[in-house]
């Protein structure tokens, strides 16, 4: 169905969604993600002749930032926002951008889409890992991060480099780099670790590195913070809304390898106060990523729209 819609401008899925809406007659339709869900739902609403349900549009990740750069996508995003009753996102950045594209909808409270996570409350163990998110694609650039960190060589001491959620290019690059340098580099292919196992990995990590050309808040970064790892994240995400640069973590420009290496060294050599940063990050997580608090915010989305109907 999705393949057909690539050629039929989302009308196939749109017709199916319209049929389901007529059958269930919901008060509110909430779409999570602009493209696959949003574009097709826009078509569905065009097909609905009678009274339509209220529509909430939630941006995922860096969708609105990245795709609004392209005229065809920007036009589709505008058409979707034009029929929305409510809009939500993970980042203040995204609300500001959405307001430049369209208006008339209700800006709902900012909320991370992942649903939250309780901060780590167990006893601190040994943190002897530098963990890198292993995506290598149009947006994720794990190989560059790996080359930068591994380039520190003996200055890493006994720290282990770990890459998780790796795709094939990252697995190959890590294997070749380990062979040529003799460094121990541990990799986990995408899907090899459960969510709980990833959290355990973060608990034993001193540093989390995220290197991408575009992102939302970076759920992985926030989860790493919740588990006590110090975040080192590119400024193409909304990291600035969660991390105070050089105080609670480090924010750097993509491909600025010197800045990435400097951040890693500051942390592992003790120039950076990791203990104080960790305490502040735990407070941020408890305030803004607590699942109970986020559940109340989510419920408020629907209450506010039904009350104003």
Language-model features and meaning:
Residues 17-37:
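Short N-terminal targeting/anchoring amphipathic segment
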Residues 57, 82-121:
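Donor nucleotide-sugar binding/catalytic pocket of nucleotide-sugar-dependent glycosyltransferases
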Residues 88, 122-153, 162-165:
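Conserved donor-binding/catalytic core segment of Leloir-type glycosyltransferases
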Residues 200-205:
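Short alpha-helical donor nucleotide-sugar binding micro-motif in glycosyltransferases
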Residues 213:
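Aromatic "clamp/platform" in nucleotide-sugar-dependent glycosyltransferases that forms part
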Residues 230-233:
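Short hydrophobic beta-strand element within catalytic cores of glycosyltransferases
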């Amino acid at each position: 169905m999705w393949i057909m819609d690539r050629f039929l401008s989302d009308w196939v899925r749109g017709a199916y969604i319209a049929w389901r809406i007529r059958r269930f007659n919901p008060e509110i339709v909430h779409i999570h993600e602009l493209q696959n869900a949003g574009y097709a739902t826009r078509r569905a609403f065009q097909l609905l002749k009678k009274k339509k349900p209220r529509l909430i549009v939630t941006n995922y990740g860096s969708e609105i930032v990245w795709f609004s750069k392209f005229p065809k996508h920007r036009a589709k995003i505008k058409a979707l926002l034009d029929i929305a009753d409510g809009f939500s996102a993970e980042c203040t950045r995204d609300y500001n951008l959405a307001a430049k594209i369209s208006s008339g909808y209700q800006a709902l409270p900012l909320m991370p889409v992942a649903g939250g996570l309780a901060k780590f409350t167990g006893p601190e163990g040994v943190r002897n890992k530098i963990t890198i998110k292993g995506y290598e694609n149009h947006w994720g650039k794990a190989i560059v991060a790996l080359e930068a960190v591994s380039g520190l060589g003996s200055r890493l001491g006994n720290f282990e480099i770990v890459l998780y959620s790796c795709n094939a290019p990252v697995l190959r690059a890590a294997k070749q780099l380990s062979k040529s340098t003799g460094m121990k580099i541990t990799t986990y292919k995408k899907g090899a670790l459960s969510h709980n196992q990833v959290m355990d990995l973060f608990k034993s990590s001193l540093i989390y590195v995220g290197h991408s050309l575009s992102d939302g808040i970076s759920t992985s970064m926030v989860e790493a913070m919740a588990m006590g790892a110090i975040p080192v994240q590119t400024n193409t995400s909304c990291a600035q809304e969660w991390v105070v640069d050089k105080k609670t973590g480090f924010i750097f420009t993509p491909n600025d390898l010197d800045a990435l290496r400097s951040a890693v060294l500051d942390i592992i050599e003790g120039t950076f106060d990791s203990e104080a940063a960790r305490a502040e990050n735990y407070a941020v997580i408890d305030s803004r990523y607590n699942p109970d608090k986020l559940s109340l915010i989510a419920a408020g989305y629907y209450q506010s729209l039904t009350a104003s109907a």
